[in-house]
């Protein structure tokens, strides 16, 4: 009976204490998806060139670019 309790204690102790103290690494696909999602959110927040912001006679470039300062029309 004492052996049973000893095994039970070792099992519970190793699962709770050791499992709580040793952090498992984040799987690479999940980490990669999180980084891609952050990049997409950053791009969505950028202010791309919009035709209605351009002064008369100037237009946005054909390739969409993010405007840091001003409407960036050419």
Curated annotation (Swiss-Prot):
* Signal is among the record's keywords: yes
- PTM (free text): Contains 3 disulfide bonds.
**Alphabetical UniProt keywords:** Cleavage on pair of basic residues, Disulfide bond, Ion channel impairing toxin, Neurotoxin, Potassium channel impairing toxin, Secreted, Signal, Toxin, Voltage-gated potassium channel impairing toxin
Task: Tell me the tissue specificity.
Answer: Expressed by the venom gland.
List the record's Gene Ontology CC terms alphabetically: extracellular region
Which stretches are tagged as propeptide in the UniProt entry? Answer: 20-41
Q: Does the keyword Signal apply?
A: yes
Renumbered to this chain, the signal peptide range is: 1-19
Compartments where located: Secreted
Supply one GO molecular-function term.
potassium channel regulator activity
Task: List the coiled-coil residues.
Answer: none
Q: What does this protein do?
A: Toxin that inhibits voltage-gated potassium channel currents in DRG neurons (IC(50)=about 570 nM). In vivo, induces neurotoxicity shown by twitching, paralysis, and body contraction. In vivo, insects injected with this toxin showed signs of neurotoxicity including twitching, paralysis, and body contraction.
**Family of this protein:** Belongs to the scoloptoxin-07 family.
Name the chain's protein: Kappa-scoloptoxin(07)-Ssm2a
Task: Record the organism.
Answer: Scolopendra mutilans (Chinese red-headed centipede)
């Amino acid at each position: 009976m004492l052996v049973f309790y000893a095994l039970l204690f070792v099992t519970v102790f190793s699962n709770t204490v050791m499992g709580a103290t040793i952090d498992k690494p984040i799987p690479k696909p999940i980490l990669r998806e999180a980084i891609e999602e952050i990049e997409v959110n950053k791009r969505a927040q950028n202010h791309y060139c919009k035709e209605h912001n351009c002064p008369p006679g100037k237009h946005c470039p054909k390739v969409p670019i993010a405007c840091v300062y001003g409407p960036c029309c050419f």
